[in-house]
């Protein structure tokens, strides 16, 4: 039943309207049977008791038949509900809305992709806001590319350039390293700022064309290529269950990066702060000022890739 008192059946039928119409039809039939039919040509007077008995018999049979039909409808509708749609195609312009919807209805999130720009800038804040608002614990697993693997970084940047030629100049090895470092630094800080957040970070050594976002309600499969639709698999679908297992195995085969507590829980505001946190995390050791500045910029001004790249 919705806020207007409307109660919908399996096919969206207004139950109250249906029952009211059925009652009105029954009353009309009784009036016709008692007062109209006896006055038709050649009709004999019918006693009230005979009419009531006839009506009760008819209604009893109708009620039994209606009950059987209703049970069949409920049974088959229940089977339909137990077998959700296996996959839905999400238009490029609707991807952000679908991810936001999933983030606002989950207590866990598993990400597997490349730099996690969108996750860091948009999904993660939504997850934290929901956890704080409802007092729930939040479990987050994030798998990004290993920023210290130079060959991997070069392979990814070349792939990213080819996937989006209009932004070819944006992606460089340093840009990719900076975006990944910004994601890790953000997660490291938040994991100690929010007691209800359980966060684990994994470093992958291979590049996939797909980005996986797994929540309690669905799994979203997106691609780096601009203008490409996403695939959404709802919870209960075979692919959703398979993806959960795949993510678990993939994380086990990746390198988990510890998130040590900083003595000052730094929220980097300068190049020296970034250098200190990277040293604490033991990634990108010996990074020069250019890379540190790129990392600081990515951290302080996260970019929504669906809006600009």
Residue ranges of each PLM-predicted region?
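Signature of lipid phosphatidyltransferase scaffolds
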Residues: 226-309
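HKD (HxKxxxxD) catalytic microenvironment of the phospholipase D
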Residues: 199-240
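A broadly tuned preference for mixed-charge, low-complexity surface segments
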Residues: 29-34, 124, 157-171, 257-284
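Low-complexity, flexible helical/coil segments
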Residues: 142-154, 163-164, 175-182, 236-241, ...
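HKD-type phospholipase D/PLD-like phosphodiesterase module
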Residues: 153-210
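PLD-like (HKD) phosphodiesterase/transphosphatidyltransferase domain
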Residues: 71-162, 286-309
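Alpha-helix boundary/N-cap detector
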Residues: 43, 47-50, 171, 175-178, ...
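N-terminal alpha-helical membrane-insertion module
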Residues: 1-95
